[in-house]
């Protein structure tokens, strides 16, 4: 059932013996003759891998998020793990408590040829981690390896990650106790009677209306086979769930029991303020597996239609009831156990997964908590819990102000293969994915905080796909609320939060805050005299700034400006998101009035001379197409795809009024309405700004999908060729100083010399997004962040 709704699996695989393999799929993976060959996210729990040259192999040229616990390797001749793409933030690999028997090499690094040898014939890998390590908050990470082994203890029978369900001949069918499941009959009494009478109760497909709490016995097992088509449903306005009062559960476990709930959907409606979908106080051996909280996106109704959480009509506004119920899944009062495959996307609830007041161990496998108004996952006064491959998703409307995870008054917590995602349609900045307050001993392994996803569409220009990279991913991965510290890196393999750090290291460099209070600024450009122009897109304002004049509003017409460029005559070219393929207009910012010139795209062929404006940051589209070479069983790498695609010239371009500047007409995909209410996606719109060079000249730009900075030769139509690596960092943007040093915005501002080595860093109070050299002598580095404009002087 969950697989039908989400791209997730939890399956049983045989490697000589059958044990549980739990993994998340976000891209490609295959079984090759030498072992698992995969890309983009995998988690192994309690897995046997035997009699094979390679255990798990990460594709050539790809980073990955690989996490394993209690994995057993036996007779693996070449390497248990082959790690690719070293010294890249997207390579995050970790193993805990992995046993190795006759495995001479535990890790082989493909690119460097380095190896981590086994310790004798049989050994235990207590810890292995590779990737970016965060040593303390307020500092960038460094690439490192952690490898700790020990003697292998005597063999013991492995413990299943997920308990087995009782045999089907022990199941009692709830229909035999009078339940109807017809979406209208009150089945409360029949459900409770079945539970009181039998240990294992089976619910056939149906919608079972409930008007009071269904209470489990300590050993109750509730089994359904599809959480979308088998639901317990509280009807709107159910009397016992109304008004202000203490939480009242739809389904409630017994305290300290070892009950099981499997394959069931729980629907608390929209207008039931006191509702909790699942109130869990059961013990460490209990299990909640494949449970879907209904009420959010994708909710099935009894008549086969889908609920719309955005629906508004003359009689009812669903959005008025967001964040009006208690948490959907609430584990409290000593509750614990194993939670696997929970999908909790109901924005009517306070949070998707809420754990309070417990030291009972808990293990959470592949939780997806989404679409809540304030927080997706909350821990308060919690100890001894593990979250393995949790995902959160914050929507543009119901999640614009939401944090992914809140951890309060807690300790001894593990988050591994964590994914904090804000949808690409987001338009509002948010400071941090994870908030930590008054806590300690929180271990983070393999953290991925992002805001990009693929989109496919057809329009008058044909069909196309595009990887939309949002400008509004969380600015920081983690914020220590107590000590006012941040982890600015959004991709890393290891960070141990102790709670003991009280202040950040002294900042490097010196920056001055010139202006503040913006919604989100970017799209800047500097004219020949060094004056800065930039856009606050949300408020549709174009500003200028100079030392003498300060901040000036240049234009504030409602024309949806996004990015600016400037020609040799001082005319501003404005790329607007308005129009089916976006629009470009120009005006002279030195002249008063509202005169402007609309610029239509014209063919590139036949035009010589002038500068070409190209994006300062790109994101490579690695989705949708089959990248596997069946002869070599290798995938086209992101680097190969990027070099191929960025070299393609555009057929048309927008030429400035004086002919000195051309903006290639990048393909624009529309999502939503054709007017200003729809979204537009294009490299030229998703970038934080433009860089320019004449045909045959070099530009410096970043590839966010590799997190690297390159230089390349610009051709007619904006194709960029002859790529050369400039820096092994590359986030939101880059700029070249008068002396040739390259400044890269990637959490902080990193300075690289002509030899490609880092030679300095400038720490900025907020995440830098765009860098521009300006001022009278072009030695003022302007640093644009979402909410403020900073500057520093470069000697």
Summary of predicted features, one role per range:
Residues 9-15, 211-225, 375:
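Classical protein tyrosine phosphatase
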Residues 44-48, 70-72, 94-97, 200-203, ...:
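Well-ordered beta-strand segments characteristic of repetitive beta-sheet solenoids
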Residues 205-206, 219, 227, 334:
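Tight coil/turn sites that cap or link beta-strands
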